[in-house]
C-alpha cells in the first residue's frame, strides 16, 4: 500500500490520477502538516474513491498541547469524521516526550465511535523509548503507526522499523514515511518487511506573486523562493508502477 501525503484538494487529485489508493490529507505541509479544511475533504470524497486519512494538528512544532488546543483538535476530528474522513492521524506527547495516554485514549474513543481508523503520526519519532511507546499505542487501540524509525529519514531509521515490524507487525500496522520515493521505496519495504509506505511525491510550482518589492512570502529553499510545493502526478505514477 502506498499512501500519498497531500496538502490540498489539488494534491489529492494528483495523487488519485497518479494511481494512489489512500492519502493523508493535510494543510500547510511546510509546517509538517496541519488540519485540512472541510472543503478539501468534501471535494476529495465527492470526486474520487480515495481512502482519506485526515491530519488533526492545530499548529507546527511539537505535540504537547494546551487544553485549548486539545479542545480544538477534538472538535476538528469530529467534524472531519462527520464529513467522510476514513481515519484520523494525530499525536499527543507529554512534556517528557512520552505518549500522552489520556488524550490519546480520548481521541481513539472518538474515532472508534465512527468505526474509522486511528493513526498515530510521527510524533512517535520524538519519543525516547520506541518499544514502550509502541506497546502503549497498541494497548490504546491505535490501528497504524507512521514512523521514520526515530530518524530524520526512514532510510536511516530502517533498522528500527524492521525491529518494530518483526516484533509488533501482527498487532499494529507499521507505515514508514519521510524521504521515501520511487528510488528507495521498494528497498525499504523489502528490508523492513513492512507492507505500507508514505510519500509526499513533492514537486514545486511557481507563483510570481510570492514576492513583492519589499515583502516575500517564500517558505521554500532559495532555489524555490517563488514556488510552492505540491504533489506530482508523475512522481506518484513512478511509485505506483513499482507495484508495492
What are these regions (language model features)?
Residues 2-6, 23-25, 52-56, 88-90, ...:
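Hydrophobic faces of well-ordered beta-strands that scaffold small-molecule active sites
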Residues 7-14, 64-76, 125-140, 164, ...:
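Catalytic cores of alpha/beta
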Residues 10, 29-48, 68, 93-111, ...:
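Active-site-adjacent beta->alpha loops and helix N-cap segments on the catalytic face
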Residues 15, 80, 107, 121, ...:
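Conserved, mostly hydrophobic/aromatic
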Residues 18-23, 48-50, 84-87, 113-115, ...:
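Glycine-enriched alpha-helix->loop->beta-strand junction motifs that scaffold or abut catalytic
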Residues 24-34, 79, 83-95, 142-155, ...:
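Glycine-rich phosphate-binding active-site loops on the catalytic face of alpha/beta enzymes
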Residues 39, 44, 50-104:
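Glycine/small-residue-rich loop that forms an oxyanion/phosphate-binding "nest" at active or ligand-binding sites
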Residues 60, 168-244:
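C-terminal alpha-helical cap/extension of soluble enzyme domains
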Amino acid at each position: 500500500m502506498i499512501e500519498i501525503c497531500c496538502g490540498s484538494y489539488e494534491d489529492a487529485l494528483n495523487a488519485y490520477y497518479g494511481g494512489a489508493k489512500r492519502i493523508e490529507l493535510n494543510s500547510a505541509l511546510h509546517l509538517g502538516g496541519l488540519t485540512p479544511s472541510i472543503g478539501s475533504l468534501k471535494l476529495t470524497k465527492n470526486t474520487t474513491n480515495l481512502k482519506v486519512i485526515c491530519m488533526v494538528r492545530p499548529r507546527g512544532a511539537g505535540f504537547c498541547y494546551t487544553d485549548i488546543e486539545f479542545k480544538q483538535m477534538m472538535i476538528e476530528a469530529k467534524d472531519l469524521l462527520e464529513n467522510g474522513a476514513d481515519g484520523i492521524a494525530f499525536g499527543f506527547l507529554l512534556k517528557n516526550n512520552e505518549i500522552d495516554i489520556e488524550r490519546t485514549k480520548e481521541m481513539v474513543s472518538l474515532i472508534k465511535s465512527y468505526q474509522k481508523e486511528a493513526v498515530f503520526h510521527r510524533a512517535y519519532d520524538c519519543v525516547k523509548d520506541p518499544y514502550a511507546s509502541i506497546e502503549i499505542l497498541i494497548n490504546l487501540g491505535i490501528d497504524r503507526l507512521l514512523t521514520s524509525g526515530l530518524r530524520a529519514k526512514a532510510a536511516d531509521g530502517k533498522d528500527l522499523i524492521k525491529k518494530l515490524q518483526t516484533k509488533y507487525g501482527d498487532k499494529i500496522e507499521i507505515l514508514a514515511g519521510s524521504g521515501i520515493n520511487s528510488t528507495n521505496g521498494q528497498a525499504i519495504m523489502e528490508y523492513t518487511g513492512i507492507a505500507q509506505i508514505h510519500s509526499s511525491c513533492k514537486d514545486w510550482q511557481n507563483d510570481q506573486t510570492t514576492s513583492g518589492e519589499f515583502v516575500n512570502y517564500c517558505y521554500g529553499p532559495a532555489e524555490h523562493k517563488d514556488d510552492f510545493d505540491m504533489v506530482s502526478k508523475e512522481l506518484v505514477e513512478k511509485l505506483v508502477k513499482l507495484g508495492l
